[in-house]
């Protein structure tokens, strides 16, 4: 069988992980009811996830330099699939927060590795492709949300929903990650200079503010949209 090109493979990997995000976005009310918590408790879960993601992002570059983007993607894709399996059986908020932190670390490392691989493809192919990669991410969120919505409408259980996604998506993600080339990152000649964290120019701060604003709007929809629709609009 002809091997899938790494360009198409990384697009599908974006799509697969985003499908899990779609599952999460629609099932947040289910998780809230399962934990018997309030909106503050849901906020703690989101905060734990965000902190875990940030921690992983800080160390992701060093891990990629020691291994490769393909290795990090393989580990995080396996983790993302397996970490979903215990979710329906957790009923304590504090335990779910710890779990959310670990989940966030996996997700953060995945995002860095996946975008690094995509950026290297742009350099290799000498053309802009990032918008196309992220288009598959958006399609994945839409697809995951749509299928989960159908399963909810048809009264399928949360456990069935998760098993269906993991059984299908985990093997697919492993197949497509095997189609990737092994990219080994190397430190640049300027790596010995002072850490850029302390010498960020104004432009970097502006870009960071724009990214934060975008994350706030994205999070308000992804994380709270389903709760708002159920509890206030009563859909």
Residue ranges and their predicted role:
Residues 78-91:
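C-terminal ends and interior cores of transmembrane alpha-helices
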Residues 36, 68, 89-94:
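Helix-breaking motifs and short loop linkers at transmembrane-helix boundaries and internal kinks
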Residues 56-68, 152:
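Helix-to-loop junctions at the C-terminal end of transmembrane segments
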Residues 83, 94-103:
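Paired small-residue
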Residues 24-25, 200-235:
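Extracytoplasmic gate region of multi-pass secondary transporters
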Residues 159-178:
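Symmetry-related core transmembrane helices of the 12-TM Major Facilitator Superfamily/SLC fold
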Residues 70-73:
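Primarily marks hydrophobic transmembrane alpha-helices of the MFS/SLC 12-helix fold
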Residues 100-135:
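Cytoplasmic helix-loop-helix junction between adjacent transmembrane helices
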């Amino acid at each position: 069988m002809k091997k899938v090109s790494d360009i198409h493979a990384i697009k599908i990997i974006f799509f697969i992980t985003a499908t899990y995000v779609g599952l999460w976005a629609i099932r947040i009310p289910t998780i809230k009811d399962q934990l018997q918590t309030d909106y503050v408790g849901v906020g703690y879960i989101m905060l734990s996830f965000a902190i875990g993601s940030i921690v992983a992002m800080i160390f992701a570059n060093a891990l990629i330099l020691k291994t490769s983007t393909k290795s990090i993607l393989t580990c995080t894709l396996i983790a993302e699939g397996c970490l979903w399996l215990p979710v329906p059986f957790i009923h304590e908020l504090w335990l779910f927060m710890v779990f959310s932190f670990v989940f966030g670390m996996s997700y953060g490392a995945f995002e860095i590795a996946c975008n690094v691989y995509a950026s290297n493809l742009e350099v290799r192919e000498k053309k802009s492709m990032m918008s196309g990669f992220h288009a598959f991410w958006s399609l994945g969120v839409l697809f995951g949300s749509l299928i989960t919505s159908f399963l909810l409408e048809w009264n399928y259980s949360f456990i069935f929903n998760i098993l269906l996604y993991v059984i299908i998506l985990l093997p697919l993600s492993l197949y497509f990650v095997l189609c990737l080339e092994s990219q080994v990152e190397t430190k640049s000649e300027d790596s010995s200079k002072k850490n850029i964290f302390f010498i960020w120019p104004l432009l970097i701060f502006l870009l960071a503010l724009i990214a934060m604003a975008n994350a706030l709007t994205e999070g308000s929809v992804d994380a709270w949209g389903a709760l708002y629709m159920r509890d206030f609009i009563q859909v």
